[in-house]
């Protein structure tokens, strides 16, 4: 299993880092078999798996439950778990307690926090306490309720400079990596070159030190709306839906199960059960 020191070396050597967001045992198993470097258990599971319209309703118990499943499916892969909405916006002590609960109960190797500002101090204190932290800048889904959209961030010079300053701040606080989401690729390149820690991009161009996409987006599974930055490497929905429809049709027509799908008893045992005629 790769560790933070390995990710630093990969950045130094120009080797791209691969991260995939997964939420359960079978998807994590697939990801580990594909030899991805990291798994993110994102609070996006609220929308992708649980059917919410945002990440806000996701709880720590949700994150722990899904991370435990991911760990069982990918025991040899570095796992990062999102701290959900409002679990790191209280006191430092509350933040440390919540991070400890997630790491101890789920087995995650690191936690991810969105934003900067007051979050920078939380990253520093978590790092001091021995909890590895991945930062997240740019589009931060937990803040969409305030910003009102999922649009590209940091397009103006002022916003770009603010993001650069925040990236340097979370690095100084001890973050082991930064997710850069939905920012101009030129800015992502500058940030990546300015930092000694790895940058993991999603909608941030190819110049970041690594990339992350959601498992479901990669395989084309259950996605009703596809973001511009997503590339689907398969279209699983195109095979799933007809397969399920065929099953329903065959059961209704009593053509499934066939004899080959059924178990039988020896004729002699049947006679013993029902009596001999």
From Swiss-Prot:
Pathway: Cofactor biosynthesis; (R)-pantothenate biosynthesis; (R)-pantoate from 3-methyl-2-oxobutanoate: step 1/2. Mg(2+) binds at residues 43, 82, 114. Gene3D superfamilies: Phosphoenolpyruvate-binding domains. Signal peptide: none annotated. Homodecamer; pentamer of dimers. Belongs to the PanB family. This is 3-methyl-2-oxobutanoate hydroxymethyltransferase. It comes from Listeria monocytogenes serotype 4a (strain HCC23). The lineage of its organism: Bacteria, Bacillati, Bacillota, Bacilli, Bacillales.
């Amino acid at each position: 299993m790769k560790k933070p020191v390995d990710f630093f070396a990969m950045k130094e050597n120009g080797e791209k880092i691969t991260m995939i967001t997964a939420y359960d045992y079978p998807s994590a198993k697939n990801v580990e078999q594909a030899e991805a470097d990291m798994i993110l258990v994102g609070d996006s599971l609220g929308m992708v798996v649980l059917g919410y319209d945002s990440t806000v309703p996701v709880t720590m118990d949700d994150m722990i439950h899904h991370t435990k499943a991911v760990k069982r499916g990918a025991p040899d892969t570095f796992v990062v778990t999102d701290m959900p909405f409002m679990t790191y916006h209280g006191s430092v002590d509350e933040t440390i307690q919540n991070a400890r609960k997630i790491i101890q109960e789920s087995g995650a190797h690191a936690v991810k926090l969105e934003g900067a500002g007051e979050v920078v101090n939380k990253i520093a204190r978590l790092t001091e306490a021995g909890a590895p932290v991945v930062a997240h800048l740019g589009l931060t889904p937990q803040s969409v309720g305030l910003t009102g959209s999922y649009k590209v961030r940091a397009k103006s010079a002022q916003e770009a400079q603010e993001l650069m300053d925040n990236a340097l701040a979370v690095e100084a606080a001890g973050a082991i990596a930064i997710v850069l989401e939905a920012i101009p690729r030129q800015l992502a390149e500058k940030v990546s070159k300015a930092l000694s820690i790895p940058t993991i991009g999603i909608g941030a161009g190819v110049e970041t030190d690594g990339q992350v996409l959601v498992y479901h987006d990669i395989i084309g599974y259950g996605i009703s709306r596809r973001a511009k930055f997503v590339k689907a490497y398969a279209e699983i929905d195109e095979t799933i839906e007809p397969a399920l429809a065929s099953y329903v049709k065959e059961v209704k027509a009593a053509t499934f199960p066939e004899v080959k799908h059924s178990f039988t008893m020896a004729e002699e045992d049947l006679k013993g059960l029902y009596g001999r005629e």
